[in-house]
UniProtKB/Swiss-Prot annotation:
It comes from the Eukaryota. Residues 25-260 form the Peptidase S1 domain. The keyword Signal applies. This is Renal glandular kallikrein. GO terms for molecular function: serine-type endopeptidase activity. Keywords: Disulfide bond, Glycoprotein, Hydrolase, Protease, Serine protease, Signal, Zymogen. The lineage of its organism: Eukaryota, Metazoa, Chordata, Craniata, Vertebrata. One of its GO terms (biological process) is regulation of systemic arterial blood pressure.
Length: 263
């Protein structure tokens, strides 16, 4: 089962013992404090839902399948439960999913099918007021060049450090290094569609991965933001089954146009 599908089951159905969606970095480590100042925590009401990326003082990029009707975000967080004076809480004025993302895939009664296409899994979220850019809250640039297969990539997120569905969440922001693989590797590993607007990254030996709720968080390859977490298998971190990320170089023009046309 894809962790995106698990995301939907938890988000729509809920779990008594845990928030409906949580990040899960497998085989990672505590990120150095304030080393990921562009990483955003996206909440629905007071429940953590997804990751995101700060693109400028007004805009956050996340996954389209993280769409909800009651957003709030935290910027500059390291530990989700500690009072961190340098962190910033923000409300949202609008959310704009990519028009090519099939929102019907998010319906509660949707039955997953191998022909489902989760391309265009990205969404822009505008803050109600500009973020204050500081040492711990900083935007990151969009890519200007294609990523290179074999690159060393860094993914980050909050949550479980185990690959099962036990939801043992981490309080601290976790980081994990992954290898950028060819899309052919992911096409062989998954029965679902892997398209040219996706990136394939993981550890072929298993044990390192992103998973449920890391959706929308950054994939930074050789120091450049190249993707955001989209979908993958559960359990996470299986051998020979890398994860899928939205390929941002394919959407640079759309992102820039939306930001320019919604001042």
């Amino acid at each position: 089962m894809w962790f995106l599908i698990l995301f939907l089951a938890l988000f729509l159905g809920g779990i008594d013992a845990a928030p409906p969606v949580q990040s899960r970095i497998i085989g990672g480590f505590n990120c150095e404090k304030n080393s990921q100042p562009w990483h955003v925590a996206v909440y629905r009401f007071a429940r953590y839902q997804c990751g995101g990326v700060l693109l400028d003082a007004n805009w956050v990029l996340t996954a389209a399948h993280c769409y909800n009707d009651k957003y709030q975000v935290w910027l500059g967080k390291n530990n989700r439960f500690e009072d961190e004076p340098s962190a910033q809480h923000q409300l949202i004025s609008k959310a704009i999913p990519h028009p090519g993302f099939n929102m019907s895939l998010l319906n509660k009664d949707h039955t997953p099918h191998p022909e489902d296409d989760y391309s265009n899994d990205l969404m822009l979220v505008r803050l109600k007021k500009p973020a204050e850019i500081t040492d711990v809250v900083k935007p990151i640039d969009l890519p200007t060049e294609e990523p290179t297969v074999g690159s060393r990539c860094l993914a980050s997120g909050w949550g479980s450090t185990t690959p099962t569905e036990e939801f043992e969440y981490s309080h601290d922001l976790q980081c994990v290094y992954l290898e950028l693989l060819s899309n052919e590797v992911c096409a062989k590993a998954h029965t679902e569609k892997v398209t040219d607007t996706m990136l394939c990254a993981g550890e072929m030996d298993g044990g390192k991965d992103t998973c449920v709720g890391d959706s929308g968080g950054p994939l930074i390859c050789d120091g450049v933001l190249q993707g955001i977490t989209s979908w993958g298998p559960t359990p996470c971190a299986l051998p020979n089954v890398p994860g899928i990320y939205t390929k941002l170089i394919e959407y640079r023009s759309w992102i820039k146009d939306v930001m320019a046309n919604n001042p």
